[in-house]
Amino acid sequence: MKILVDENMPYVEPLFGDLGDIIPVNGRTLTAEQVREADVLLVRSVTKVNAELLSGNNKLKFVGSATIGTDHVDLAYLAERNIPFSNAPGCNATAVGEFAFIAMLELAQRFNSPLKGKVVGIVGAGNTGTATAKCLQAYGIKVLLNDPIKAAEGDPRSFVSLETIMAQADIISLHVPITRTGEHKTKYLFDEARLKALKPNTWFVNCCRGDVIDNQALIKVKQQRDDLKLVLDVWEGEPTPLPELVPLAEFATPHIAGYSLEGKARGTFMLYQKLCQLLNITADKSLLDLLPSFNIKAVELATAPNEKALLQLARFVYDLRDDDKMFRNTFLNENGFDTMRKNHQHRREFSALALAYDGQSEVDWLSNLGFSGVGQ
């Protein structure tokens, strides 16, 4: 069995090696000719899976995408061809949630404006939005959720309108899928009018899809309003973001919010489980066995940390400033965006860092944030 797989997916060999011949490929430049003889195709969001790519293949048994979203996959075409498909919903939700939370802590430090006491509006309450809310609520931050689709489906959480978030939130964090049609389309959800209407001193975080924001309009508005603080991980026109926009962001990264080692491993592992199910064989590999131990095994925690100490704790796991600096230095290079993604040293999630508990600190909230070892 020939398994064609994006070269940037981790842990493919230990998981799929016993199931067939693994053929790594460049996901962004993948051609129909390369796919022609594949039995299994495993992709990421950079690969457009459609009739143009697959029409020459008559033996495909399974298509898997190690992503939360599916907007890069023509699901109707796969259904028409009776080709089984699976993605990995929620695989990197924790990573994105922690990324957004860390970015807010970094902004708080940079501008000497504590995160504690601010109101955060989360637009999109699916997997990544929920993970972001979990971090914030563990730290005692008031969160407003906006998700008209979840609300209509009967989700029991309390939701507010986008207008309410824009009026009340000090920080807005975007976590919606990209939809280009329909009542709740999200393409250019934040157009020039909405961007201009943001309340003074808003922190604006985008970790979902670049064209949820009109990037040209964002440049125009930001140039007029220095009070707006931007954290941008996604960009319209990836992998070539508008060069004028990058310097306007406080933190800029190349679509890597979900790039934790745990999240990437989880995405590959979910596809492994699905393929085993499809082939009616036992999935006998373990996700925990794949992950290496963290290089800093434990941190002593004598008292509940203040915000500055919490940021230092978070930086043990991931220092956003490093990726921001590297991106600014490389994004204008040929293939700089994709090269940084490909060579990214996947960060760890909070759970990789064990906290030694002395029995005196009030640290339940750190456990809720995801750190391990608390209370043990």
From Swiss-Prot:
Residue stretches spanning the membrane: none
One GO term describing the cellular component: cytoplasm
InterPro entries: D-iso_2-hydroxyacid_DH_PdxB, D-isomer_2_OHA_DH_cat_dom, D-isomer_DH_CS, D-isomer_DH_NAD-bd, Erythronate-4-P_DHase, Erythronate-4-P_DHase_dimer, NAD(P)-bd_dom_sf, PdxB_dimer_sf
Residues involved in NAD(+) binding: D147, D233, G258
Cellular localisation: Cytoplasm
Catalytic site: R209, E238, H255 (proton donor)
E.C. numbers: 1.1.1.290
Any one Pfam family match given in the protein's UniProt record, by short name: 2-Hacid_dh
Catalytic activity: 4-phospho-D-erythronate + NAD(+) = (R)-3-hydroxy-2-oxo-4-phosphooxybutanoate + NADH + H(+)
GO biological process, one term: pyridoxine biosynthetic process
Keywords recorded for this protein, A-Z: Cytoplasm, NAD, Oxidoreductase, Pyridoxine biosynthesis
Binding site for substrate: S45, T67, Y259
Pathway: Cofactor biosynthesis; pyridoxine 5'-phosphate biosynthesis; pyridoxine 5'-phosphate from D-erythrose 4-phosphate: step 2/5
GO terms for MF: 4-phosphoerythronate dehydrogenase activity; NAD binding; protein dimerization activity
Main location: cytoplasm
Similarity comment: family membership: Belongs to the D-isomer specific 2-hydroxyacid dehydrogenase family. PdxB subfamily.
Self-association and partners: Homodimer.
PANTHER family for the chain: D-ISOMER SPECIFIC 2-HYDROXYACID DEHYDROGENASE CATALYTIC DOMAIN-CONTAINING PROTEIN-RELATED, D-ISOMER SPECIFIC 2-HYDROXYACID DEHYDROGENASE FAMILY PROTEIN (AFU_ORTHOLOGUE AFUA_1G13630)
Purpose of the protein: Catalyzes the oxidation of erythronate-4-phosphate to 3-hydroxy-2-oxo-4-phosphonooxybutanoate.
Name of the protein: Erythronate-4-phosphate dehydrogenase
Gene name of this polypeptide: pdxB
